[in-house]
Structure formats: C-alpha cells, structure tokens
Amino acid sequence: MKSTVETLSPTRVRLAIEVPFVELEPSLKKAYREIGQQVQVPGFRRGKVPAVVIDQRVGRGTVLNEAVQEAIPQNILAAVREHDLKTLGRPEVEITEFTDGDSLNFTAEVDVRPELTLPDLSTVEVTVDELKIDDSEIDEQVQSLRERFATLKTVDRAAGEGDFVQIDLNATVDGEEVPGGSASNLSHEVGSKQLLPGLDEAVVGLAAGASTTFTTQLVGGDHAGRDAEVSVTVRTVKEKELPELDDEFAELASEFDTMAELRDDVRERVTRGKRVEQIYAARDKALEQIVEAADVPAPEGVVREEVESRKTAMVDQLERIGASMEEYLAAEEKTEEQIDTELNEAAVQGVKIQLLLDTVADAEDVQVSDDEFGHEIVHRAQRAGVAPQQFYDQLVRSGAAGAVYGDVRRGKALASIMDRITIRDAAGEPVSLDALRAENEAEHAHAE
C-alpha cells in the first residue's frame, strides 16, 4: 500500500491511497468465503462452493465490490498511522480507479485534530460574581421546605391563588369534542400554570360545584394552533395549611433539633451552591478565553455530526415526554431555523472545547487509571438505571467505550486548567477551588 497526504485546511486532509491487487487477496478470499456461506448451489455443501461457481452465480463484480469495501477501512487506518494523523469523524471515500487485476486507487477526505498553540494557562484570569447570601434567600429555601410538609384542607369558599382544586375539563373546537381533550377529577394548584393557558384565571372565584368556560389555543394534536372552548367544573377547593416554623418543625423536616440549626444548615447549602455556580462561571469564562487565545478552529464535518447528534437527542427527549418538535417550537415561540442555528452555535463551541481539552491532555500526558474509568462507568450506569457490567458490555458492543475514556481524560485536563488559572470575584478577592473540594469531601464523609 502506498499513500500520500494533502492538507486541505488546518482541520482537513485528503489521503490518496494505492493498494496493489495482490494485497487485496485476503479481502477477496474473505468475500468468497462469506458469499459462499450465503448461496446454495446443488451438488455443493454450503461454504464449499468454488470461487468460479460463485462468480457464475453472483458475478465477479459483486465479489470484488465486497472485497473492496472490506479493504478500504483497513488501508485508511494504515495510512492514518503511517502519517501520524489524529482523525475526527467519518472519512469521505471516493474510488478513483479500479479494475479486476489492477491496483485499487481511492481518496479519503477526513477531518483531523488541528495543531494548537496553547497560551500560558497561569496567565489566564477570570472574574465572577461575589458570593453574597441574603436572608431572603434563606427564607425562600425554608419556605420551600415548609411547603413540602403542608397539608390540604377542604374549604367551603371560592378558589384563590395557591389553592388546590379538583376539576373536570372538556375541550371542543367548532362544537366538536377534541380527541383526548376531556379529563375528570384532575388536581391542580391555582396559579401554577401547569395545565392549559387561561385555566388559572377561569377557576379563580369558583366554589365547589361551579362551572365556567374559557378559550385557549391548543399547542398539540390535530387542532394545534386553533382556539378551543374549554368547560371546567370545580369539584372541591382545598387550601394549604403550613406548619409553624418552630423547633418541632425542624425535628420533623430535618436531622436538627432547632430552627436555628436548620437555618444554619440551609445557609451552608446555599453558600455551597453559590460557590459551585462561581466555579461553573469561571470554567465557562476560562474555556472561552483560552479557545479564543488558541484560535481553535472547528472542523465542519465534526460540527455537522454533532449538530445531528444533538438534534436527534432533542427529538428523542421530546418523544419520551409525549411531545413533538412542532409542539416544542410553539411553546418556545421559535422556528426550526432558529433551533438549528442555536444547535450549530452550541456544537461549534462544544467541538472547539473538546479539541482544546484533548490538546491539553496530550501536552500534559494525562492518563486515565482503571479505577477512574471504572468509577465513570459506575456513575453512568447508575444514571441509566442498569448494572455497571451490563452498561460496560453495551459500550463495548457499540464501540463507545473509547468515547467514555476520552470524556474522563478531558475532565482531568479541565481540572488541570482550573487549578492553574486565577479566579477572582467582582471585589477582587480570590476564589479558591480548594475550599469547595474540602466541603464536598466533608459532606461525602458525613454521608458515609
């Protein structure tokens, strides 16, 4: 096999590969063997059909085509190794010349990792918001906890904001019932805007047994975009009874004996959450700054594949919740072109960051231990709700284990970046990663 490489851009090359016919012999033998297992010829056992008979039955061209398709990836891989290329995505192959008995000539265009010049990471400095905790934020968290322990009490009055109502609904368009537009005994919190637009306004002021109608625009189904007349009947009205914020509540709702201890714990958790937000903000700003300084290009083919992957994931997620892309677009008040633009922008930045982290990992010779890889497998298996070994086996079968390994390696490269940059808040005070790590370790130790 002979090969040459032509640089088309900083992120794309064209390989020109010539494979002598004699080097195709192993692929030809394999093609004859596999085709021989599939055809039935009287007088011959399956798999024992002579090549000349196979040529007569299916044609020599069919065998050659199968051999070529099997040989091309192998020779691309050999050429990639010969020229020490770091390829990305799938190659685009074009056979330029091939006849029976002569050399196979083809080209393969493929995206490659660009050569990047990294800035001195120790000179990178980012600024994030100050860590400020207001008492109102603590009050909000405590109130949220209080709401979780509320009880519902039936009342003999009209429904108001924050009440829970049991309702019956029936929707019609032009006097005809909407398929799936009826429901009985639904529980709804007034003011939550969880169901139909206009429902909250309609039920305010209605007591048990009262009915009314309102108009709403349908976002899904055969009548999407049309106005529907909806009748609603209130069965019951219930109000929330909140527990008193005293030491008894602290014992009920937490591991603490007093409200003072509970509030202190809430403050610590809010503080930790804001520290995490600071670090995330610092991470995003640092990566954006370094990507710009390193002038990281985004290979078009890789970006295209990433956009397709993200859009497929979006559609799958919508299907899991029983929604369509059309319904999503209506709810977000966006066009498909706007969604595509957003996906493309996110994909471009994501690909640039991935290339940057790979370069940092190479420059610092980042390694992933078996324990680190295994921990990631366990973590992902838990999120997927399957056993770790089953999850790993699925990765191996799908050829995705290497991608997970790459993610772990990039994560370690990112951690290295974060350790070397300078982070300050808006007041000029340094923001330390060590404090957050110590808190997390202490929390994990306490949980164990």
Swiss-Prot record:
One of its GO terms (molecular function) is protein folding chaperone. Residues 162-243 form the PPIase FKBP-type domain. Its main location: cytoplasm. Coiled coil: none annotated. Its EC number is 5.2.1.8. It is found in: Cytoplasm. It comes from the Bacteria. The keyword Cytoplasm applies. Keywords: Cell cycle, Cell division, Chaperone, Cytoplasm, Isomerase, Rotamase. It catalyses: [protein]-peptidylproline (omega=180) = [protein]-peptidylproline (omega=0). One of its GO terms (cellular component) is cytoplasm. InterPro entries: PPIase_dom_sf, PPIase_FKBP_dom, Trig_fac, Trigger_fac_C, Trigger_fac_C_sf, Trigger_fac_ribosome-bd_bac, Trigger_fac_ribosome-bd_sf, Trigger_fact/SurA_dom_sf. It is an enzyme of class 5 (isomerase). PANTHER family: TRIGGER FACTOR CHAPERONE AND PEPTIDYL-PROLYL CIS/TRANS ISOMERASE, TRIGGER FACTOR-LIKE PROTEIN TIG, CHLOROPLASTIC. Belongs to the FKBP-type PPIase family. Tig subfamily. Involved in protein export. Acts as a chaperone by maintaining the newly synthesized protein in an open conformation. Functions as a peptidyl-prolyl cis-trans isomerase. Consists of 3 domains; the N-terminus binds the ribosome, the middle domain has PPIase activity, while the C-terminus has intrinsic chaperone activity on its own. HAMAP family: Trigger_factor_Tig. NCBIfam families: tig. This is Trigger factor. The lineage of its organism: Bacteria, Bacillati, Actinomycetota, Actinomycetes, Micromonosporales. The gene is tig.
